[in-house]
Design a protein with these regions (language model features):
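Conserved alpha/beta enzyme-core scaffold
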Residues: 1-273
């Protein structure tokens, strides 16, 4: 089945106000920047977005945030976006902060049809006990706080250094899976059937977001014909992808660097002094 659509505009045509979106990428690596820009131009609003980050002030999801198009974020690391902090603290934006590994597993579980899972991450904190500020009012008071989650003790076996096994009781918290109306992802390569290959860091969250979306839209830097991708090299099978958008060379090359770091040039004239 050929899943290629003619343009980003066509790809996001049925995303409407109030939709929930899982958006791939890690930092600015592998973010579906073209699809995000299309949503910005479309003016769709009241969105709930699930993403590890929220872009920066002028790129990625930061564009939707600046336009007031996002109502709620479920995220892990958001410290690079000043507008995000302003909207959160002023009560304009609701934020559910989630541990990064937990967020990844919630997305994976949603894609696998698993309702929830038990984890030790967050036990003994506001993640499990509740009270984490989700939304402030305009006076800086907590208007909406996270609810307490179900916890339970399980016997966990572990192996000691001497080879013996010990069983201990540990407390776990129940985390519910995440499934969204749509998922937006970016792939390095993809074929017309929606099979995708991600490059380096962009593989961190893109496959998981794609799994969690009921309708997954992938923008691909290079489109190939079915059969050209090595089956063993495919990171995400096409069963999870409903639409594919081929980027132009200019769109594929338009990538931002969040923090530019370089190695200082070595002054060889001072060596051996």
């Amino acid at each position: 089945m050929d899943k290629v659509v003619s343009s980003p505009t066509e790809a996001v045509a049925d995303i409407s106000d109030g939709a929930t979106l899982a958006v791939g990428g890690f930092g600015l690596c592998g973010i579906p920047s073209v699809l995000i820009a299309e949503l910005q131009a479309k003016g769709v609003g009241d969105l709930e977005c699930v993403s590890n980050n929220c872009g920066v002030d002028d790129w990625g999801l930061g564009l939707l945030l600046a336009g007031g198009q996002i109502r709620r974020m479920v995220s892990s690391y958001v410290g690079e976006n000043k507008e995000f902090a302003r909207q959160y603290l002023s009560g304009e934006l609701e934020v559910e902060l989630t541990p990064q590994g937990t967020l990844a597993e919630k997305l994976r579980a949603g894609g696998a049809g698993i309702a929830g899972f038990w984890t030790r991450t967050g036990v003994g904190t506001q993640i499990a006990d509740g009270g984490l500020p989700w939304r402030y009012d305009d006076a800086g008071n907590i208007a909406v706080a996270s609810p307490a989650k179900e916890t339970r003790s399980f016997a966990v076996a572990s192996r000691r250094a001497d080879g013996s096994t010990v069983t201990e009781e540990h407390e776990f918290v129940l985390e519910e899976a995440i499934a969204t109306d749509f998922a937006l992802v970016r792939a390095w390569k993809g074929d017309r059937h929606g099979n995708l290959v991600f490059r380096t860091t962009s593989r961190n969250f893109n496959p998981l977001c794609a799994m969690a979306g009921r309708v997954t839209i992938a923008e691909v830097e290079e489109l190939v014909e079915p059969g050209e991708l090595d089956p063993d090299a495919i990171h995400l099978p096409g069963i999870y992808v409903q639409r594919v958008v081929e980027l132009t060379p200019e769109q594929a090359a338009d990538k931002r660097i969040e923090k530019r770091t370089i190695t200082p040039t070595r002054d060889s004239s001072k060596e051996g002094v």
